[in-house]
Every structure is written in structure tokens, then in C-alpha cells.
A protein has these predicted regions:
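Short beta-strand scaffold segments in enzyme catalytic cores
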Residues: 124-129, 134-136, 145-147
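Short linear motifs in intrinsically disordered
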Residues: 11, 30-36, 114-119
Length: 227
């Protein structure tokens, strides 16, 4: 897609949310959905700055988290009640982020701002890559999120579940060398008593992830196969 096709306002098909687009979009190549009529749904893409991202990894949460931080789901108009737009999601994340970032870190920062502003209607895992770094971001409920820098000697094998199992909140809310998150994530965890660790080591997978039979039958099997 080129600059000539850039729009100043992005209106999403599924959620009807309006997101203003900044100036200075770069050219990028993406893999859109082959079926028209449901939005772009780009699975992945690379832009002119050689930054890549993928944003179609559906993950899961649990009732405790979603009760405290509901997904931002589109509500159609009913009678005299106007419609309520939903958040952003898989159909638009690549389009809203990739043309405007020059590094993987910038990708995390831009998507993080969008999530905190508009929320999301689904749980997703998103990867960002440039010449020097790879970052993995996972959404938590509506506007909350967290991201980790993938070490150079590691790789990510992620099934359809929330998978980050270690997180340094001090770094994420401070220098952000290897971790980033939504600005109020620490308060969110404390307010709703989501930290289930007994040893003082916060495990996001225990706090935010799913723990049901489908994980054992489906997701854990995918991990073993991919590794």
C-alpha cells in the first residue's frame, strides 16, 4: 500500500470505531484476508523501514480478568439507544500500526497507546521485528497490555493462549529496557487481586491466562509439536 491510499480517518468494519491516522505513513506490504467484506485482516506485513509485524495470534484470558477489564465490544443501535463503537482488533492492527513505526519498540509503543485509548474487542498476541530487536505483546482484557523483548538466543512458540510467564513490572514502568506495559497495569493487578504467585515472582500467565481443559487438549499439544 502506498501513501496515495492513506486515509485521515480509519473506520473499522467490525467495531465501527473511528481512529484518526497521523501524517507520514510509509509504504508497506501486507497479507490481507482473501475474503472481501470483513476488513483488511492483514496477518502480517513489512514496511519501508524494514520493520515487520504479525497480528493474528488469537489468545485467551479468564473470567476474573474479563470481569475486571471487559473487552470493548461493539453494541448496535437499539430503539432510541445509539450504537456504541467497539475497540480495535485483528482486522485493523497491522493497518493502524505498521505504516507509522521505524523500530519494533515503536510498534509496541504505538499499539500500546491505541489499546489504552480505544481498547480491544478480542485477545491477541502481536510480534514486532526490526534489525536489532524482537518484541512480543499480549493484550489483557480491554485496554490493558504487556510486552517483552525476546532475548537474542530465544524464540517464541505460542499457541492460542496467553503465554508470557515472567514479567518485570519495575522495568516496564521505569526504564523499559526489556519490558513494557499499560501505564496502570500495576494498580490494575493490585486492585483486583490478580497476582496469584505465592513466592513474590509475578507470573502473568497465572494471573491473566486461561486454565481450562481446552488448554491441555489443544494449546499444550501445539507447544510440544512446535518445539
Amino acid at each position: 500500500l502506498s501513501l496515495r491510499r492513506q486515509r485521515q480517518m480509519c473506520i473499522r468494519d467490525r467495531s465501527h470505531v473511528e481512529v484518526p491516522l497521523p501524517e507520514g505513513a510509509m509504504r508497506f506490504t501486507a497479507m490481507p484476508n482473501a475474503v472481501e467484506g470483513k476488513g483488511i485482516w492483514a496477518a502480517s506485513g513489512v514496511n519501508a523501514a524494514n520493520v515487520g509485524m504479525t497480528a493474528t495470534e488469537t489468545i485467551t484470558s479468564n473470567p476474573r480478568v474479563l470481569g475486571a477489564d471487559p473487552l470493548v465490544v461493539y453494541q448496535p443501535a437499539r430503539g432510541e439507544q445509539p450504537e456504541v463503537p467497539g475497540g480495535i482488533g485483528e482486522e485493523d492492527i497491522v493497518y493502524l500500526v505498521l505504516p507509522y513505526i521505524h523500530t519494533a519498540r515503536e510498534g509496541v509503543e504505538r499499539l500500546g497507546r491505541l489499546l489504552e485509548t480505544y481498547g480491544t474487542y478480542e485477545m491477541n498476541g502481536i510480534a514486532f521485528q526490526d534489525h536489532d530487536e524482537i518484541w512480543w505483546l499480549e493484550t489483557i482484557g480491554g485496554p490493558h497490555w504487556m510486552a517483552v523483548k525476546v532475548p537474542d538466543d530465544h524464540y517464541v512458540a505460542m499457541p492460542n493462549q496467553l503465554g508470557i510467564d515472567h514479567f518485570d513490572l519495575e522495568d516496564a514502568l521505569g526504564e523499559q529496557k526489556e519490558y513494557m506495559c499499560s501505564a496502570d497495569l500495576k494498580e490494575f493487578i493490585e486492585t483486583y487481586h490478580l497476582d496469584l504467585s505465592m513466592d513474590g515472582n509475578f507470573n502473568p500467565r497465572d494471573a491473566f491466562g486461561s486454565h481450562d481443559d481446552s488448554d491441555h487438549v489443544y494449546n499444550l499439544s501445539l507447544i510440544h509439536i512446535s518445539e
